[in-house]
Amino acid sequence: MQRPLIVAASLSAAIVALAASAVAQQGQLQLPGGGLKPPPPPPVRPYQQVAVTPPAPFDDPSFVAFRKQLADVVARKDRAALAKLVVTQNFFWFQDKDLADKRKSGIDNLAKAIDLDAKGGPGWDTLAEFADEPSAAESPQQRGTYCAPADPGIDAKAFVALGQATGTDPADWAYPSKDGIDVRAAAPPNSPAIEKLGSVLFRVLPDSGQQDDPNQPLVLHVATPSGKTGFVDAAAVAPLVADEICYAKDSGGWKIVGYLGGVAQ
């Protein structure tokens, strides 16, 4: 995903470079009749460890208070109150370009970006996760705009080399949100642990998803640097590439000013 306006310098540059490399390496397969299908995922094999430093909390007291206010509004699913926490004009919504409709209000653009108004849609849950996210980082290109979650600390060159060596895309990678998570032999949470992951990148395999029993927690099927495969609790994992929500502070306090990512258009 390109982010023409808001870009976190070194890691985002590495992600763009690796994404371009992955597209060039993988291509697509031609099907009879002229159709295309994605290539098979790269094989699982051991890979070089790349250390990760999780993003630090943005502990500005006024921002912490704003997040609490946002969490309260989201818990009530109060759209009118939410509108007061979003800029009325000049809201931006980037995927490969700015998708915001400048004729509409900020809340209407935010709602479209996260499917807020869809019955049973993910919008309110998405906002709840952002309200709970303590990190945020100022954009080098737009001072005074802070986007969350902030990028983790990673050696950009090592990450590009990792992606090229494994033939993977940036979206295939994640890291533990806390140091030391168990990798289990099977999806059920009582399965034996086969390895413990520290603060390093690990590969998320494409068959990750909800277990057959909806009462069981969401797990991710992963490949560790040692070349083993197993399952980790999705709640203990942060994806390397994810949507971001952006904030800015004016005389009236903090406001939501933009969104990076969102529902496919």
Indicate where each model-derived feature is located.
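N-terminal signal peptide c-region/cleavage motif recognized by signal peptidases
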Residues: A17-S21
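Bacterial N-terminal signal peptides that target proteins for export
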Residues: M1-S10
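Boundary regions of SH3-family modules and the immediately adjacent low-complexity/disordered segments
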Residues: D117-Y175, H221-Q265
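Short, well-ordered alpha-helical segments enriched in acidic and aromatic residues
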Residues: D78-Q89
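Short, low-complexity N-terminal intrinsically disordered segments enriched in polar/charged residues
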Residues: L29-D72, K84
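SH3/SH3-like beta-barrel superfamily modules
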Residues: I194-V237
